[in-house]
Curated annotation (Swiss-Prot):
Its EC number is 4.2.3.133, 4.2.3.77, 4.2.3.57, 4.2.3.-. The Asp-Asp-Xaa-Xaa-Asp/Glu (DDXXD/E) motif is important for the catalytic activity, presumably through binding to Mg(2+). This is Alpha-copaene synthase. A motif (DDXXD motif) lies at residues 290-294. Gene3D superfamilies: Farnesyl Diphosphate Synthase, Terpene synthase, N-terminal domain. GO terms for cellular component: cytoplasm. Pathway: Secondary metabolite biosynthesis; terpenoid biosynthesis. Its cofactor is Mg(2+); Mn(2+). PANTHER family: ALPHA-COPAENE SYNTHASE (PTHR31225:SF222), OS04G0344100 PROTEIN-RELATED (PTHR31225). The keyword Transferase does not apply. Converts farnesyl diphosphate to the bicyclic olefins alpha-copaene, (E)-beta-caryophyllene, and to the macrocyclic sesquiterpene germacrene D. Also mediates the biosynthesis of minor sesquiterpene hydrocarbons including delta-cadinene. Involved in indirect defense by producing volatile signals attracting natural enemies of herbivores.
Length: 539
């Protein structure tokens, strides 16, 4: 049995600090001032432009300046750049790749020894440069051995510098190094980075690139957006309470705040409120479906429920199911109908795609239950095929599109639900492998189905330690695929690919350190408090 929720109905009773009209007015003024900084920066050197883009992104206000950032990056990509500073070269590489703009790995050849191609010891005592290299190299794609070497080199020397006390005089750099060694910056959710970076930016040792108007905007914008998220959490928690009144408070795991966080990880901007609210509820319904197959239903009841979900008819005879599962099924049907009601007439077709994804999820859950009851350990490839489907990522990725604006076209839905979608599969692999590593480390599995770690051990006849490391390498391979999709895929799909990557980033939050923070949600509470409860001080 999963631990109880750490949130309960907290957000129903929570009263956010009231917004000041003057704060909203000030944000408008500050946006104009920062936009002018971008205009002024066009006349300055490449390094100043790069630093401005980086600061705006890390402070979490880049959603206000998409056009300015696009223009700046095109200028950065096209401008002559001959720097031999490791931090500057790494920063340019990272910024361009983060935005799907190609830059080759040979940019780092100047920091390698001609004799054997290894990285030069001359950069081994440059923590700022090494940190930049480490974060840049985490955007590697398949076949980039030089960036594999860069990651190992930078990590080894950063850890050595930390152990030797080389960062004692730079506490904020030390904090950034610590964060990146846990989760590299390009795999970190923007809002989480903003929580840490806002105080770091305000107290930076190097004041060259500190702009008071940017800092003030970041603080105000964070709090104003947090107020939006708090109101949404109140609404979605009320929805959850109503659902529990029907199906029972103990039907499944109470993780509505965590489900909202998953939706938030894909889009936190105010203009995506409708999409976020639909997705949060859909994720909760997927979580309850998982709990139903795992804990509520017998094998035969799982089969009957899957048939009912395939038929998707509330008038269907479901009398063979227990009353609680009947109620759950009818609530699923009702909620999907509500999703449709919340869409415009020309958008209503979208819910059919979400329904299809939910049906496929049910089918994968049933397959795992069948294996469990047979005591069957599938081949590693068969397990990955089914367990990446049961990770629920396709439901989340299709569901992400349901409430979005005009960018969510029918063609994008077809692409998202396609069986050969390597982006969705890579995100599912990150999820499945990290989840299974957490399960394996704690010595228990939520169900009795073997994990991918155990399947690999049996098939390859290796120890748990060897299998564990191998599964970890598969996580890295999946990230390479996600990075590659942003660089060489259809540019029109880049915004969607980046949001799927945001979902993969959320898995780093849920499972880093091989801890399952969805099941053991008390480990996630402090992070969610920083995002949804604690205000950023305005001074």
């Amino acid at each position: 049995m999963a631990p109880k929720t750490v949130w309960g109905y907290f957000f129903i009773d929570y009263i956010p600090e009231p917004l000041q009209v003057s704060d909203k007015q000030r944000v408008v003024e500050l946006k104009g001032e920062v936009a002018r900084l971008f205009e002024d920066c066009n006349c300055k050197d490449v390094v100043e432009r790069m630093n401005l883009v980086d600061v705006v992104q890390r402070l979490g206000i880049d959603h206000h300046f998409k056009e300015q950032i696009d223009t700046a990056l095109k200028n950065i990509q096209g401008a002559e750049f001959n720097s031999s500073d490791l931090h500057e070269v790494s920063l340019r590489f990272r910024l361009l790749r983060q935005h799907g703009l190609w830059v080759p790995a040979d940019q780092f050849d100047k920091f390698r020894r001609q004799e054997d191609g290894s990285f030069s010891s001359d950069i081994a005592d440059d923590p700022k440069g090494l940190l930049g290299l480490y974060n840049a190299a985490s955007l590697l794609i398949h076949g980039e051995e030089v960036l594999e070497e860069a990651l190992l080199f930078a990590r080894r020397h950063l850890e050595s510098i930390r152990r030797g006390g080389g960062l004692h005089d730079s506490p904020y750099l030390s904090e950034q190094v610590g964060r990146s060694l846990k989760i590299p910056l390009p795999r970190t959710l923007k809002r989480l980075e903003a929580v840490s970076y806002i105080p770091e930016y305000s107290s930076a040792d190097d004041t060259t690139y500190i702009h008071p108007e940017i800092l003030e905007l970041a603080r105000l914008d964070f709090n104003l957006l947090q107020h939006v998220h708090q109101n949404e959490l109140r609404t979605v928690t009320q929805w959850w309470k109503g659902l529990c009144d029907v199906i029972g408070p103990d039907y499944g795991r109470d993780r509505i705040v965590e489900c909202y966080f998953w939706a938030f990880s894909m889009y936190y901007e105010e203009e995506h409120a409708r999409a976020r609210m639909i997705l949060a509820r859909l994720i909760m319904l997927a979580s309850l479906l998982d709990d139903t197959f795992d804990d509520r239903a017998t094998l035969q009841e799982c089969r009957e429920l899957n048939k009912a979900i395939e038929r998707w008819d509330e008038s269907d005879d479901i009398s063979l199911l227990p009353e609680c599962i009947q109620k759950f099924f009818l609530e699923v049907i009702r909620n999907f109908a509500e999703f449709e009601d919340e869409l415009e007439a020309h958008e209503k077709y979208r819910v059919a795609y979400a329904r299809k994804a939910y049906q496929l999820l049910s089918k994968s859950y049933l397959q795992e239950v069948e294996w469990c009851h047979q005591g069957y350990t599938p081949s590693f490839d068969d397990h990955v095929s089914v367990s990446t489907a049961s990770a629920g990522i396709q439901v989340l990725c299709v569901g992400m599109l349901v409430g979005m604006g005009d960018a969510a076209t029918k063609e994008v839905f077809e692409w998202m639900i396609g069986s050969n979608n390597r982006v969705v599969r890579a995100c599912a692999e990150v999820t499945r492998f990290m989840d299974d590593m957490a399960d394996f480390k704690r010595g228990k599995n939520k169900t009795d189905v073997a994990t991918t770690v155990e399947c690999y051990m049996k098939e390859q006849n290796v120890t748990g330690e060897v299998a564990f490391d191998k599964i970890g390498s598969f996580v890295e391979d999946a990230w390479k695929t996600l990075n590659q999709a942003a660089l060489v895929g259809d540019r029109a799909l880049l915004p969607v690919v980046q949001r799927v990557a945001g979902l993969a980033m959320s898995m780093m939050v849920f499972f880093h350190g091989k801890i399952d923070r969805y099941t053991d949600s008390e480990h996630l509470k402090e992070t969610l408090e920083d995002l949804f409860v604690n205000h950023v001080p305005l001074c």
